[in-house]
């Protein structure tokens, strides 16, 4: 990459922080991206959106969005940037809004006949016995609009259900209950039109929760994931299909479970995944020879789509 290419990106705002429940992770991601772009010669500036008025972003030529959670990953900041005429990285308004809503994402995936675990919305008035009868136990209870596994819990007995629902409801009015898939956890990163190598996650914590993602030293990551060539091709294609059906674009991540019979099940999509030293997209990129600085540069380059009027 030449200095002329870096200069052509103009003044770049690396958006981070914000005021969501994932603020601290976003600050770490954003700082890492900012430093990578600066090393590449990009005129980047770190911008905490909780401390800067949106109108001030008109002074930038483009934005690298490293915000996680509400206000950053749900289409809100994307819509604001479009109104301001500032090109940005990643998915557009629609893709982000859908991707942030686990319930509606799964409705779309089911409509496209993609493999999704059985599930239902869990409300205070929901008939618990009917839910368990139709979906089964164990269950995974989760807020419909939070990331980083915030508010999630595994329920193995009927008497645990209400406490798990109440905890998830602290973060969201919509609470999702879906069948727990016993098996291996996998994730596939998307970069442009390409699915990167799958990663298999191994944690002693029962599932890949917030602690396992960001704090635990016990989580193990396997890339290559130990799949056959056909299985690797299958999970990558499934990730691309799920990403496109949800209206996502640019870059992101799709999470899976693989059951004991070898079937892959879609869990959720991440339109702005973490970019910390524990993060999965940089790990998958390294597996194909793309270092962190190059990864950030490629994601930034993708913002040119919006200058051409493409979603």
Swiss-Prot record:
PANTHER family: D-ALANINE--D-ALANINE LIGASE (PTHR23132), D-ALANINE--D-ALANINE LIGASE B (PTHR23132:SF23). Coiled coil: none annotated. Keywords: ATP-binding, Cell shape, Cell wall biogenesis/degradation, Cytoplasm, Ligase, Magnesium, Manganese, Metal-binding, Nucleotide-binding, Peptidoglycan synthesis. One of its GO terms (cellular component) is cytosol. It catalyses: 2 D-alanine + ATP = D-alanyl-D-alanine + ADP + phosphate + H(+). Pfam families: Dala_Dala_lig_C (PF07478), Dala_Dala_lig_N (PF01820). Belongs to the D-alanine--D-alanine ligase family. ATP binds at residues 132-187. GO terms for biological process: cell wall organization; peptidoglycan biosynthetic process; regulation of cell shape. Mg(2+) 2 binds at residues 268, 270. GO terms for molecular function: ATP binding; D-alanine-D-alanine ligase activity; metal ion binding. Binds 2 magnesium or manganese ions per subunit. It is an enzyme of class 6 (ligase). This is D-alanine--D-alanine ligase. Pathway: Cell wall biogenesis; peptidoglycan biosynthesis.
